[in-house]
């Protein structure tokens, strides 16, 4: 199979939503875990799993702070994450541009 340049970590639809949501923020801005959860529509456990994968790749950063008795987690896209998203979107544009301009697919479809 041809390497299409699509980052498999970002290509997962849920992680793409997370990264795209964070990328829409001005540089340096963060979202609270709860706000991100509401925007993406995930359970806390599911969001934690995806955030952990993105943080392991240095695509996002998270920080826990205390406000009295309440713990607040904030999440931000890192510079590395922004570059990865930019590369992913360019690879997607290239792939779709090739298809739209009459490029050929890596495989042929057989009709039965």
Label each PLM-derived region with a short phrase.
Residues 1-16, 20, 57-59, 103, ...:
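N-terminal leader segment of winged-helix/HTH proteins
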Residues 6-46:
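N-terminal helix-turn-helix DNA-binding core of bacterial DNA-binding proteins
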Residues 33-65, 69-70:
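Canonical helix-turn-helix DNA-binding module
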Residues 67-88, 92:
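Basic, amphipathic "hinge/linker" alpha-helix immediately C-terminal to the N-terminal HTH DNA-binding motif
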């Amino acid at each position: 199979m041809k390497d299409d340049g699509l980052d498999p970590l970002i290509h997962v639809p849920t992680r793409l939503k997370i990264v795209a949501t964070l990328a829409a923020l001005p540089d340096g801005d963060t979202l609270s875990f709860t706000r991100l959860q509401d925007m993406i529509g995930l359970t806390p456990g599911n969001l934690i799993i995806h955030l952990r994968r993105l943080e392991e790749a240095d695509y996002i950063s998270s920080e826990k702070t205390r406000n009295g008795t309440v713990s607040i987690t904030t999440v931000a896209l890192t510079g590395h994450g922004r570059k990865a998203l930019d590369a992913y979107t360019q690879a997607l544009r290239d792939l779709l541009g090739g298809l739209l301009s009459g490029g050929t697919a890596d495989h042929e479809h057989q009709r039965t």
